[in-house]
């Protein structure tokens, strides 16, 4: 999808865009964050409280989050808690991509989702902060058909 938007709408990747703080090309070439060290730290400290981990890649939230859930559990993610990234707004606008398709294709700036016991979420978030991460509580898991609901 991104190739189509680039080929048809964003042909000049050297254009500086103030919203991005860099050129489109520089933003698209920004390296993927690697979460191994902070994740290993958190697993070592809170292993029994971690119920699932999902690397949000191609397939976005709708395909990746359910993979970490057992049958009978549904994730509810509050989209308003996800900080907006200008590059995704640009891609959606230039490519006329519907919002649901954006969340089904891209990670929207959320590279990793961790499901933890509700009573340990603050402790796990604190441990991630101590590792230099910026965790956000995006929602919760509840009983239901295995899957994910994005709530606006």
Predicted regions mapped to residue ranges:
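Buried, small/hydrophobic-residue-enriched core segments of structured protein domains
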Residues: 1-8
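Glycine-/charge-enriched secondary-structure boundary and capping motifs
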Residues: 8, 12-29, 33-152
């Amino acid at each position: 999808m991104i190739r189509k938007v680039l080929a048809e709408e964003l042909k000049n990747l050297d254009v500086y865009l103030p919203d991005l703080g860099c050129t489109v090309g520089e933003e698209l070439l920004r390296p993927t964050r690697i979460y191994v060290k902070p994740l290993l730290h958190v697993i070592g400290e809170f292993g029994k409280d971690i119920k699932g981990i999902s690397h949000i890649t191609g397939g976005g939230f709708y395909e990746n989050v359910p993979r970490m859930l057992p049958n009978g559990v549904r994730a509810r993610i509050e989209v308003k808690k996800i900080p907006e990234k200008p590059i995704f707004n640009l891609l959606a606008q230039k490519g006329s991509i519907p919002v649901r398709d954006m969340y089904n294709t891209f990670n929207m700036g959320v590279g990793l989702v961790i499901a933890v016991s509700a009573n340990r979420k603050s402790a796990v978030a604190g441990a991630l902060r101590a590792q230099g991460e910026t965790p956000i509580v995006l929602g919760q898991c509840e009983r239901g058909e295995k899957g994910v609901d994005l709530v606006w």
